[in-house]
């Protein structure tokens, strides 16, 4: 039902401030779930299982991190038929993020710009939300995305990631290490060769210790930026293979404004997502696959607005895909369309 309704309600949502509309939609989706209406508004998507990173995904279309930063809306979002849901980014301590306004629509380009800044309630509240979700309890695949606090010096970033990993590990299907948001000062420095080696070494050691402690191996994925040249992609790919990282998510938002020059809000600071990032993110998927092959599975995300876009990510070397901005513009019908395009 929501597939048909969304084009009708979208103009009202787009008349609101982007962040207000975001919370309004999520709160009402969760309310519908609690009233037992999820079956009426959701997608029923046939199983099309894929095993990636040692995890069985019921279908290859997932929700990217950022839509549900605190893991508070998992059960409502599950109605859309995702094969997996990723929530976060979460940091050790609660933080407000950047001042509002911090999210902007560019409808002429089917794009968003955000400079949220990892606003979240902290990892302890995050874990409590995850533990309370029926989706996880019933076997849904749940990725937990971790980051660093804005006031943590970049030299101490490893400590924040380690702190979060230790707390989310028992509750995750996989854990994503986000080092590519442009909205936390100096964060992308962690994509540099020496910084990345240090971080991945720290987290792989912790992963093995936690696997022994909890008698369960939880895969680690790294989320990278689209604004990388060939040498950077090669260095990151080599590090992923060398450290035996289980997966990589390509990509986060871009700092480029080339595709949206002259549009209202185009010069707002932050990360650009949506249709304009499709080519850059797909280029990174293709180039990264050329480096890592099948040794490190790739989850493709960035600018997916239809089944053909999802298929292009797979053809470039991805094993799974994620959506976010396309969901804002297209609604839940996008999930069904992408799943159908990738079936079989």
Curated annotation (Swiss-Prot):
Record keywords, A-Z: Cell membrane, Flavoprotein, FMN, Membrane, Oxidoreductase, Pyrimidine biosynthesis
The cofactor named in the record is: FMN
Q: Where in the cell is it found?
A: Cell membrane
Q: Which reaction(s) does its UniProt entry say it catalyses?
A: (S)-dihydroorotate + a quinone = orotate + a quinol
Q: Which residues bind FMN?
A: 65-69, 89, 145, 178, 223, 251, 274, 303, 324-325
Q: Record's GO cellular component, any one?
A: plasma membrane
Q: Which residues bind substrate?
A: 69, 114-118, 178, 183, 252-253
- Enzyme Commission number: 1.3.5.2
Q: Which residues does the entry assign to the active site, renumbered to this chain?
A: 181
- Highest taxon of source: Bacteria
Q: Which GO terms describe its molecular function?
A: dihydroorotate dehydrogenase (quinone) activity
What is written in the cofactor note of this entry? Binds 1 FMN per subunit.
Has the keyword Membrane been applied to this entry?
Answer: yes
- Pfam families xref list: DHO_dh
Q: What PROSITE patterns does its record include?
A: DHODEHASE_1, DHODEHASE_2
Please list the GO biological process terms of this entry: 'de novo' pyrimidine nucleobase biosynthetic process; 'de novo' UMP biosynthetic process
The UniProt entry, under InterPro entries, shows: Aldolase_TIM (IPR013785), DHO_dehydrogenase (IPR050074), Dihydroorotate_DH_1_2 (IPR012135), Dihydroorotate_DH_2 (IPR005719), Dihydroorotate_DH_cat (IPR005720), Dihydroorotate_DH_CS (IPR001295)
Its membrane topology: Peripheral membrane protein
Q: In which pathway does it act?
A: Pyrimidine metabolism; UMP biosynthesis via de novo pathway; orotate from (S)-dihydroorotate (quinone route): step 1/1
Signal peptide span per the entry?
Answer: none
Instruction: Return the similarity comment.
Output: Belongs to the dihydroorotate dehydrogenase family. Type 2 subfamily.
Q: What does this protein do?
A: Catalyzes the conversion of dihydroorotate to orotate with quinone as electron acceptor.
Task: Give the record's subunit note.
Answer: Monomer.
- Per its UniProt record, what HAMAP family does this chain match? DHO_dh_type2 (MF_00225)
What name does the UniProt record give this protein?
A: Dihydroorotate dehydrogenase (quinone)
